[in-house]
A protein has these predicted regions:
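Membrane helix-loop-helix hairpins that form the core translocation module of multi-pass transporters
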Residues: 38-113, 199
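Short alpha-helical transmembrane interface motifs in multi-pass membrane proteins
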Residues: 8-13, 82-85, 115-119, 150, ...
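Hydrophobic/aromatic residues within the transmembrane alpha-helices of Major Facilitator Superfamily
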Residues: 15, 19, 52-53, 89, ...
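Juxtamembrane transmembrane-helix termini in multi-pass membrane transport proteins
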Residues: 2-74, 133-150, 154-155
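Core segments of transmembrane alpha-helices
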Residues: 120-133, 191-194
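Hydrophobic alpha-helical transmembrane segments of multi-pass membrane transport proteins
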Residues: 147-171
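Selective transmembrane alpha-helices of multi-pass membrane proteins
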Residues: 68-99, 158-162, 166, 177-207
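Juxtamembrane cytosolic amphipathic helices that cap and anchor the N-termini
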Residues: 5, 108-113, 122-126
Length: 207
């Protein structure tokens, strides 16, 4: 590993960001408990793809471009906030509903879930700023293409295991049973979580 790259620092920072509660974690948890492992993995794959998109974009300086063109940040910010608010509304409606559901009745198209995960990640403007900051900490200005590729792959593989691990964890029989028993409470918590995330994105600043 090239000594100029502080890969451990990058991966530790990425780990802390991945394990902290956020839109991606909430979405994977809710989908995995309600619809099963397959659906959770499909969603996690979309979120991982989104991580690759932002990671590559950060390498090519999209964060700096956003800083120079505020309107780009604003467009992504409002789209991201609107999408999270939509997810909050769906979760709130499910929490209010007293209709009992079965796990297998919520199965959805895997490609649609992949797209949902991708949109969830690429409409969060904080992600590109996070990756830009992350790379500024551990990647030297004169890094070669090979070094940048190493970082992108390392962070991408790291994200893959974290997000897919969540899908396996929350789709376990214990978690599924718990979800069915406390579905309305879970959905209420998801609604609040997505709502708070939406408000935070609306209040996000470039500097």
């Amino acid at each position: 590993m090239p000594q100029e790259i502080n890969l451990p620092l990058i991966l530790i920072a990425a780990l802390l960001a991945s394990v902290s509660p956020g839109p991606a974690t909430l979405a994977i948890a809710g989908t995995s408990m309600a619809s099963g492992k397959g659906s959770g993995l499909a969603l996690a794959s979309g979120i991982t793809a989104g991580s690759f998109v932002w990671s590559i974009s950060a390498v090519f300086g999209l964060g700096a471009i956003m800083l120079a063109n505020v309107w780009m940040f604003e467009v992504v910010r409002y789209f991201g906030a609107a999408y999270l608010m939509y997810l909050a509304f769906k979760a709130a409606r499910s929490a209010i509903s007293q209709k009992e559901i079965a796990v297998k009745s919520i199965t959805g198209c895997k490609s649609a879930l992949f797209t949902k995960g991708l949109l969830l990640h690429i409409t969060n403007p904080k992600a590109i700023l996070f990756f830009s900051s992350l790379y500024s900490l551990g990647v030297p200005a004169g890094a070669t293409i090979g070094q940048l590729t190493l970082v992108i792959l390392a962070v991408g593989i790291h994200s893959f295991f974290i997000f897919h691990g969540y899908a396996f964890l929350f789709s376990s029989k214990t978690m599924t049973t718990l979800y069915l028993r406390l579905r309305r409470w879970f959905e209420g918590a998801f609604a609040i979580g997505f709502g708070v995330a939406s408000v935070k994105i609306l209040g996000a600043k470039l500097l």
